[in-house]
Amino acid sequence: MDKEERKTINKGQEDEMEIHGYNLCRWKLAMVFVGVICTGGFLLLLLYWLPEWRVKATCVRAAVKDCEVVLLRTTDEFRVWFCAKIHFLPVENQPNLNAKCLVNEVSNGHAVHLTEENRCEMNKYSQSQSQQMRYFTHHSIRYFWNDAIHNFDFLKGLDEGVSCASLYEKHSAGLTQGMHAYRKLIYGVNEIAVKVPSVFKLLIKEVLNPFYIFQLFSVILWSVDEYYYYALAIVIMSVVSIISSLYSIRKQYVMLHDMVATHSTVRVSVCRENEEIEEIFSTDLVPGDVMIIPLNGTVMPCDAVLINGTCIVNESMLTGESVPVTKTNLPNPSVDVKGMGEEQYSPETHKRHTLFCGTTVIQTRFYTGELVKAIVVRTGFSTSKGQLVRSILYPKPTDFKLYRDAYLFLLCLVVVAGIGFIYTIINSILNEKEVQEIIIKSLDIITITVPPALPAAMTAGIVYAQRRLKKVGIFCISPQRINICGQLNLVCFDKTGTLTEDGLDLWGIQRVENTRFLLPEDNVCSEMLVKSQFVACMATCHSLTKIEGVLSGDPLDLKMFEAIGWILEEATEEETALHNRIMPTVVRPSKQLLPEPTTAGNQEMELFELPAIYEIGIVRQFPFSSALQRMSVVARTLGEKRMDAYMKGAPEVVASLCKPETVPVDFEKVLEDYTKQGFRVIALAHRKLESKLTWHKVQHISRDAIENNMDFMGLIIMQNKLKQETPAVLEDLHKANIRTVMVTGDNMLTAVSVARDCGMILPQDKVIIAEALPPKDGKVAKINWHYTDSLSQCSESSAIDSEAIPIKLAHDSLEDLEVTRYHFAMNGKSFSVILEHFQDLVPKLMLHGTVFARMAPDQKTQLVEALQNVDYFVGMCGDGANDCGALKRAHGGISLSELEASVASPFTSKTPSISCVPNLIREGRAALMTSFCVFKFMALYSIIQYFSVTLLYSILSNLGDFQFLFIDLAIILVVVFTMSLNPAWKELVAQRPPSGLISGALLFSVLSQIVISVGFQSLGFFWVKQYKVCDPNSDVCNTTRSACWNSSHLYNGTELDSCKIQNYENTTVFFISSFQYLTVAVAFSKGKPFRQPCYKNYFFVISVIILYVFILFIMLHPVASVDQVLEIMCVPYQWRIYMLIIVLINAFVSITVEESVDRWGKCCLSWALSCRKKTPKAKYMYLAQELRFDPEWPPKPQTTTEAKAVVKENGSCQIITIA
């Protein structure tokens, strides 16, 4: 029964959840109803806040298949609970549909993949006789009951389980009206519905927050106790806070709604049966619809795969990359000579053929009168944009030690409040107080201990940091991440466009003739090369297009095309329509590049002497793919009968697709020489196609059929200069003990060279290349280790002295750990093999891995996860194009983009410079330290006021209404919001701020200040009780309050109620505690090394000085009107001097102790803990400690690590030295 009751959905995915079934129980509902009435509605609030309690209190367990309510719990570390109600989708009254078949198909997960004719074949799999489909909705996704797996499953589109061949064979003709209605019923409306909630709904949701409920409780309590002014002040603060919060939340909803509204309802044309064209609203699109992309472009309302034509698309909304991308039709496997017809379609794998929702189609091109068509594969929230919007609407909780410790500390305050609560009750009973007064005073102590302003105070530093970041061009869509960025100790950088200049300069070319490399050439515009195949490849093999008359495309393509000085011409819409066929993009050399024509000696022969027009038409394009690391085109030279195929890409990849006899024997050596110097090398290849290959066939031929048996033509050498600020920024990060890692799609040796040039790898450091090979022909996976400095000498020397690779920490403290003097480098393929077959080597490689080359987008994400698994706080800085996954996964992802905000990254820098990284870390550290300072101050504020009230309760007195008001508003709020204004320190330092409140130094700081404050308050309180009052005539106020002079005569039951407030003890405690708030604020307002000194925070300094002067003035020179408002008793002048002495000594001791804790506290704790050899908490630090004494690490050159074939689960391995 337990297996039936608890199942798992989205297994293996990020949003994996456990699911439990429940049915409503009437008697439980009745009990809850009674409980709500008895608790005055508090039980209802509790059940609203805790969904698991709500379900368990009102329901009984049931089988998931038959339940009415499901209880969901995430399986990650947060264990968040959700509940959802089961809904039924009625199908009995739907025309043109077989209701029973429909239920069975959905129940078995075949809603899309079956054609209309064979739907009823699924009857035999169904176990349900119901004419209704059961489903629930969670985070905007529908989950239907699936009989095949006996579980709920989300409804898939054509993005899973559909082959490329099936897309052409079964889905390219479009849907019938009946099938469209069938799918519309199941998938619902195609929209990313971001409804902007009404102000009333937002208000109710905000007010029901536990924090505001607690404030409401406090206000009611204070009103009953006649603390009207303070209650009114809290109400005003709460109203302002709620209005501000409502404005911010509603603004975010409106922005998100506007972002998706551009394509929410547009008219689109779709293909129907018998080649009919129907115009429908985009909200009616379903997976399987064949959509026609208009000539003048559109904003895509869904995810669709191109099956006809070509599109130029702007994907900046998704990736942050503003360069237009060319999308071509999905290769038709029916003509695939390699028999790859069963390849499964995937939007990620085939993204160069997929139009994603929300992206803008700028231009389209079609062939021989055929329309540009795309099959809808995903709709609504299942689309790529829908998933991004879901991640914004339903963000994953942020796991940060500071917040966990904050909740723990609040719990401690609740315990302290409980002690005060019990003490107040006992003390009041002993003094025979009325029941009503006992209840009010006891509850009041709770509202004092847990400060209402704590959440607002904690977020102040983050808000100010966000403003400062915006001033330097860094925009943030996840403010809570700013604090986390203060903990970053490793940053991954993309190379091209991030560490190096975005544009590449053409250094030169090196052609191949007769399988030999010619000398390098720097002039590609020479007359001799104009009509060469090499230049023809440079002129045609690109994805450039003209947008509004301006050549646009990939920066590398632009540089290459500009270097040869050719002209690109595209057909206009009118020309295309006139010829009723595709007009290819044509490239031709400018007139000055062509050879001079021969002068005719005879006027009659002049016609024959004119130079022939030389131009090339680009017939078909296979765009660049990060996974394939190449692109190719099919082109035809004017006048030629046969077409040509041109290819460019990574040299290793291009060479592998060429005839071996055309690749020079010294290819690897020449390539290595260039890459070691940091050049970006691109290889070119060419092939004459068969004459039988017609224009029409080319449009449907597969990529693999073209990209093989090519002739190697040579290399293009591009110079990728470092950005001017790169070395300085990396040096700053290294000084701050922040590791830097390069993650790039470029060549390995080029990446290593750039890493050396920018200072990521020092000149004396060793670089070890890990070349991992997957299992093959019965052999296990293995890793070959090479040293880059000794690659050419490997055969001569089989080993290197281990002392040549010193393995020592750069600092004595593990907290200042820096990667030691060797670095690992590997490519994407090796990284994947290591992840799969060498799991126990992964942490070691993460500790010293510095260069990761030829990395695909998903591999970048896996690398970030692997680094996080060894407890690094990882930052990721990239250009946003191929780094979206890694940017989202990292603790702090920074996209270098001109866009003000990007949904792909928590942070976006408007200026494309990595100088934003230290700026972000500095601001993160400042915000983190501000949070610590504010939290410590608010803790002391609570304890000081709690102890003040407890002392006064012992003599049945209390602080006055306006005294509370003055402390909480004039002192606390002013101090909190000004002490958070300290800007970040001007440079990064090696020391890192603590990650949580539960650390020795912080706890000792708070506890010591509590002891000091409590001690001096007690001193003043008990001293004044013993103080003998002088003759009434000595009172400088010349008042006759003899009844209130001596606390021993205060409360005999006949005095006025005002005497409970206006007494020596109250006045003494009020003045001492008021100064204590200011003293701990100054003591806790830390400056260097993370924030500017507090004396540069002018608002804070001025506020503290004004408050100090004002309190000192009314203490030493009483003002009757102020004394009356604050209910202060005018005490003798001598006692004021005594109070001044207490206050001054208190300030001196507090500040001295805090400074001592700052300077020597950490050292003392480290010394104390070193006696018991404390194990480092972070995994990478513990691992570094182990590796210091491992004689087998790092692996020596020319050795091989083989995976054990027997045990594959734990990835265990053995090192075998090859002689």
Curated annotation (Swiss-Prot):
Q: Locate the residues binding Mg(2+).
A: D494, T496, D879, D883
Q: Which UniProt keywords apply?
A: ATP-binding, Endosome, Magnesium, Membrane, Metal-binding, Nucleotide-binding, Phosphoprotein, Translocase, Transmembrane, Transmembrane helix
Q: What class of enzyme is it?
A: translocase
What is the recorded membrane topology of this protein? Multi-pass membrane protein
- UniProt topological domain (Cytoplasmic) ranges: 1-28, 50-201, 250-405, 466-936, 980-995, 1088-1098, 1158-1219
Reaction(s) catalysed by this chain, per the record, are: putrescine(out) + ATP + H2O = putrescine(in) + ADP + phosphate + H(+)
Residues on the membrane's Lumenal side span 223-228, 427-444, 958, 1017-1066, 1120-1136
Task: Enumerate the intramembrane stretches of this chain.
Answer: 29-49
What residues sit in the active site? D494 (4-aspartylphosphate intermediate)
**Which InterPro entries does the UniProt entry name for this protein?**
ATPase_P-typ_cation-transptr_N, ATPase_P-typ_cyto_dom_N, ATPase_P-typ_P_site, ATPase_P-typ_TM_dom_sf, ATPase_P-typ_transduc_dom_A_sf, HAD-like_sf, HAD_sf, P-type_TPase_V
Compartment(s) where it occurs, according to its Swiss-Prot or TrEMBL record = Recycling endosome membrane; Early endosome membrane; Late endosome membrane
> What is any Pfam family matched here?
P5-ATPase
Give the matching CDD domains. Answer: P-type_ATPase_cation
Q: In which tissues is it expressed?
A: Expression is greatest in liver, followed by kidney, colon, stomach, brain and small intestine. Isoform 1 is highly expressed in the kidney while isoform 2 is highly expressed in the brain.
Q: Which residues carry this modification: Phosphoserine?
A: S813
A cellular-component GO term for this protein: recycling endosome membrane
> What EC designation does it have?
7.6.2.16
Physiological role: ATP-driven pump involved in endocytosis-dependent polyamine transport. Uses ATP as an energy source to transfer polyamine precursor putrescine from the endosomal compartment to the cytosol.
The record's comment on protein family reads: Belongs to the cation transport ATPase (P-type) (TC 3.A.3) family. Type V subfamily.
Which protein is depicted? Polyamine-transporting ATPase 13A3
Annotated organism of origin: Mus musculus (Mouse)
Question: What gene makes this protein?
Answer: Atp13a3
